Amino acid sequence: MTSPKATAPDVTASDVTVGARARILCISGPNLQLLGTREPDVYGRDTLADIHARLEQRARALGVEVDARQSNHEGTIVDWIGDAPREGVAGILINPGAYTHTSIAILDAVRATGLPCVEVHLSNPDAREAFRRRSYVAKACVARVAGFGADSYDLGLDGLVRVLARRSGAS
């Protein structure tokens, strides 16, 4: 038995409209600056810069803007999330890295914004060690995309843009 190739339907700006160039905050958490060299058998060979460049291309195709950031520091991530509404952010795409399994502070920050948030992971945490199977952050998210490697970011963005379009009544 072969496994089906997982692909999302192609989404274009004509399929989804979210108003005046919605701004998406993309946050990548601890150790993700090491992508490309850190456990490539688990996380792939794409660097975070590669992922961000593709995400920006995808965002342009969807008619949105992405502000992609990375930090190893929980407090910085919490500050970015907390500032998001005042900065005109419409939604959040987040790969909390190891904070997925530990950070009630990030969970609370996402909840406090009231913004739609999609959690993304390169690997599938549910297929890994038991301690990786709990996500505190996902409890505040509209969806979770995992296990598609670097494509998880693009798939998460596609989903988030669809959520924003539905909420604006434009889809």
Where are the regions that the model predicts?
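Intrinsically disordered, low-complexity terminal tails and inter-domain linkers enriched
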Residues: M1-A20, G169-A170
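Short beta-strand elements in bilobed, periplasmic/extracellular small-molecule ligand-binding domains
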Residues: I51-H52, E56-R69
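Short glycine-rich anion-binding loops that position phosphate/pyrophosphate groups of nucleotides
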Residues: P30-L32, G97-T100, S123-P125
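Short, glycine-/small-residue-rich phosphate/pyrophosphate-handling segment
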Residues: A68, V118, A127-S171
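Glycine- and acidic-residue-enriched helix-capping/strand-helix junction motifs
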Residues: L35-D50
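N-terminal small/polar loop signature for handling phosphorylated ligands or for N-terminal nucleophile
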Residues: Q70-I94, A98-G114
